């Protein structure tokens, strides 16, 4: 037995060696294969979380009252959820949607970790000025857009961060605008204050002048009786509809050389300087629903002019276009003059001075006895270039008998030049 023991030991060692070589060959063969570059695990697992839960969702987090889509991990949607308070905002969130809720207060505690916020939408809530914690927005150093329209604000929210670019405060009850409210807002390009209670005393000369990058200012439906002073020269779009403005000072627009569109309809304008709108960049001008008795000089680059619902009895072409240039044509393409007191159509000479006109809308005119009359006229394009004629062959030149509402033309007006999309 002692003699066989060494032999058994040798056989055993040899067998073990062969088996190990075989097993090594099998595993080496498996791992020598080329890796699958298309392989992308659906989840990344962490030792401290439960299996089957996405790794990034647990790390980044989302308020339980809200929804954070996986394809937009930095956005949090809390809109239309009947919320009364703002939930705690996780640090990674950049876009916060809280519109259409019942929120009354904005507390600093909700934003204590929200250092990366770029856009906040708190529109259509019940927020009051006295229930906004002081400085809650100013601490958000990355904030670019703030929506607070359709709330119950009585005062301009102050202070605000320097990073802010778009501020929407329409449809509130704002009547107080502190002189230093705009201090530091050097990057704001769009400010909407329509449908508030602002008076002339709140818009002092230096209130808006420091906003050096402001391009769009909406002050429609307030309580203004005069043109706002101290507007920055960067302004391109100015909305002043539905106020009580009765006059425009001489040379008022000299400091606004970049102005592209001016809306000052539904005011009390009567007499304005003849060449007050002589601006080289002005494209759209709406002075409808005022008390103007005569037309004015039309600048060369103006394309859309709205004169409806005034007191104009006649339009002298030589007055609106004193020196036609056959080389550098005026750009006017659309003119609306309905609901005035015109007794006859504008002279056909207008098409020589404005060869690009596509249509003149006369609609109904008001007579001295209060009745309405319909002018019998057609719009001709005899001075247009041949290509323009070909493009419009299929259109009807006759405007007779058409009824055009303000809403219809306002919508068209916005389609032609959507202000907010240009900013």
Swiss-Prot record:
Question: Where in the cell?
Answer: Secreted, Extracellular space, Extracellular matrix
Species of origin: Mus musculus
LRR repeat residue intervals: 92-113, 116-129, 142-164, 165-184, 187-207, 213-233, 234-255, 258-279, 281-294, 301-322, 331-353
Instruction: Spell out the protein name for this chain.
Output: Osteomodulin
Q: Which GO terms describe its cellular component?
A: extracellular matrix; extracellular region
State the family it belongs to: Belongs to the small leucine-rich proteoglycan (SLRP) family. SLRP class II subfamily.
Q: In which tissues is it expressed?
A: Bone specific.
The record's account of how the chain is modified after translation: Glycosylated; contains keratan sulfate.
User: What cystine pairs are annotated?
Assistant: 321-353
The chain residues annotated with the modification Sulfotyrosine are 22, 25, 31, 39, 51, 77, 413-414
Query: Keyword Aminoacyl-tRNA synthetase: yes or no?
Result: no
Please describe the quaternary structure of this protein: Binds the alpha(V)beta(3)-integrin.
**Which Pfam families does the entry link to?**
LRR_8 (PF13855), LRRNT (PF01462)
Alphabetically sorted, this entry's keywords are:
Cell adhesion, Disulfide bond, Extracellular matrix, Glycoprotein, Leucine-rich repeat, Proteoglycan, Repeat, Secreted, Signal, Sulfation
Glycosylated sites? 113, 121, 187, 242, 278, 316
- The superkingdom of the source organism is Eukaryota
